[in-house]
């Protein structure tokens, strides 16, 4: 009855909550059939998605990579996707780009002309709430940096991209 009289009974949340998934997908200007340009595309998409992830102060625990051919062409069709679980929740561009490249290598099928690909970051959680794990695996000699070590680099990259644009 109060609502009919113009009195709000439920408060509206003006600011939307953080996204539960972040995606970056694109259709290509021309079909791609080789693995290397597909990897380049999804690693770029992962970087853009990582920037959005950091902007909302979240971490991803899974990354989905997909690609497909044109459903409007008479040739054979192919649509593939794979979910790559991340070892630790992260917003690190390098870790996400590597996961996207690994996913593309895993699902790539030669002989098809792909017109669209994309990356989706999933199972997002707030960056401030991170459950640590006991890490008993030795750090590889060539991989001494961790996502935590690169957080200042990611901040600098976001600032440069914001000032001068992406690309």
Task: Report the location of each language-model feature.
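DNA-contacting surface of Y-family translesion DNA polymerases
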Residues: 1-111
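Acidic, metal-coordinating catalytic segment for phosphate/diphosphate chemistry
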Residues: 80-81, 85-167
């Amino acid at each position: 009855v109060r609502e009919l009289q113009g009195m709000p009974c439920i408060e509206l949340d003006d600011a939307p909550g953080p996204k539960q998934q972040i995606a970056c997908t694109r259709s290509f200007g021309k079909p791609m059939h080789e693995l290397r340009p597909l990897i380049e595309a999804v690693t770029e998409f992962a970087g853009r998605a990582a920037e959005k992830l950091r902007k909302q102060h979240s971490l991803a625990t899974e990354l989905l990579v997909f690609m497909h051919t044109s459903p409007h062409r008479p040739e054979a069709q192919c649509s593939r996707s794979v979910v790559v679980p991340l070892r630790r929740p992260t917003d690190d561009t390098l870790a996400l780009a590597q996961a996207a490249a690994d996913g593309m290598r895993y699902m790539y099928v030669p002989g098809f002309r792909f017109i669209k690909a994309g990356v989706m970051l999933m199972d997002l959680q707030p960056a401030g709430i991170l459950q640590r794990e006991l890490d008993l695996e030795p750090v590889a000699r060539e991989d001494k940096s961790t996502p935590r070590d690169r957080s200042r680099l990611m901040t600098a990259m976001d600032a440069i991209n914001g000032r001068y644009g992406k690309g």
